[in-house]
Amino acid sequence: MTTHNTGIEDQTSIKPLRLALRGTDLLRSEIYNKGSAFTERERDEFGLRGRLPFTVNTLEQQLERAYDQYQNRKSDIRKNSFLQSLKVQNQVLFYNLLTKHLEEMADAIAEYSHLFRQPEGLYISPPSVEKMEEDFLEACAGRELDLGSGGIGISSAKAVIYSLVAGIDPARTLAVVLDVGTNNPELRNDELYLGWNHDRVRGEEYDSFVDKFAKLVVTHQPQCLLHFEDFGVSNAQKLLDRYATKQAVFNDDIQGTGAVTLATLTSALQVTQSKLSDQRIIQFGAGSAGLGIARQIRDAMVLVDGTDPKVAAEKFWLVDKNGLLKKGLGDKIRSDIEEDFIRKEDDWGANDETHLLDVVKKVKPTVLIGTSTAKGAFTEDVIREMAKHTEQPIIFPLSNPTRLAECTPEDAQKWTNGKALVSTGSPFPPVDLGNGKKYTVAECNNALVYPGIGLGAIVSRAKRVTDKMIIRAAQVLGEMGPASADKPEASLLPDFADSQKVAVAIALEVMDQAIREGVADFDDKALLHDKDARKIYLESKLWKPEYREYVYDPDGRK
């Protein structure tokens, strides 16, 4: 978020931009470059006349040419390479192309973590810890951040989604990698490895290093949303707990995965017409994602249905490679797993088997969620046993990529006679149910939820991202799913092609929730009491991939 009282720049009344860049420097700036769309006046003023072809193009003409070039790339790799190249040349054209062809390019966009690996953003390592503030300020020079995130490769991709889906100005985002070393022997022995070639830092030194970075964000970009990405299972929840009450932070691996799964479950319950707190849920896989999902759904039971927290936790049975998490496992259970999620030994008996099929037989779950990366773990026996005891089994094999899914949607439907409500962690084609019907498989993709949460937090200038804000976002997304009791074969989630509309709807409700909890900080206090005005205000803040008029100013932006 911006650090000025005026907030994010109003996109409905944009004045000409004053730039100090000229000539080749301007053409090399992916943020300000217009390529052949620079006007005659701008070419004269910025020393570009001899550097560009004669004809001045419109953005629409450039878009047509770029789309032709994209289509002429026959393989996915070449298409992705073209998009990568375009992004580092001309961001307005890049985002415009994706926006205009969102449905066609949806799969590629949703998998951006595999596309963009450019050396962009800020790299921070322990050996340069004393220079951390200097490096951070240099990276932020002349920029007011809305968004900062950790981990260059995937976080650069997440920033793209924030801009494309939620209208966050890409110039106001900063991808950051906190490079704390690696224990990967292949990387350590690679002479060309570019990271810090050192044993992975842990314990107090690690905590101090991350803490210093987080404090820099609070000090110098106090209204920036800090998006944590790809922090290991032992650190993710610990860091979220540490900073969640101090600043606006969001951990996508925990909260994003939890929120989109809660949204998908909310949609499924609209089909079954049952309450969240009435479910019996087996969570197969108790890593950061699985535990994040269990916590998110439990918290929703508490906040939405008014269930006692302890009773809500007892609606879950967590299973991992050691079997059901019960007290007898002792130190095989991670220390960050709450006591309420661990089953009592007396409930099972000393000789009871507690692996997945046995747990399914005893629990008779209504919901089965997989985050185990154990391919095929939801076997025919498991699914058929579940289907014996519930009319419409809710089955979410969320492990990705596709080859690691706990089961395929086709098998889930076959083993339940077409009654299952299925969502996956990777794209799957529709399943033929017979009788002329096809089941549309919802992809439980975080990209449908975190852009709207971030946008709502940024525009409301939220001091924190609260649990209720995230739960409300999940409810909104779930309510937008096409599936219903009358049409159970429809997708449980909106199509990614509708993600921009989804983000705005989520953001509005997140803003409302921020107001209800007293964490919003609008300059115009009238916005606190007028939802229609907030909608207009939100829409005025959305960055759009359009060219602005430039005026040369030696003291302008560089």
Residue ranges and their predicted role:
Residues 352-418, 446, 461:
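Long hydrophobic segments that form regular secondary structure
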Residues 2-247, 535, 541-556:
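N-terminal ligand-binding/catalytic initiation module
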Residues 246, 251-367:
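Glycine-rich phosphate/diphosphate-binding loop of Rossmann-like nucleotide-binding domains
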Residues 32-33, 250-256, 269-272, 393, ...:
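Adenosine-phosphate binding glycine-rich loop
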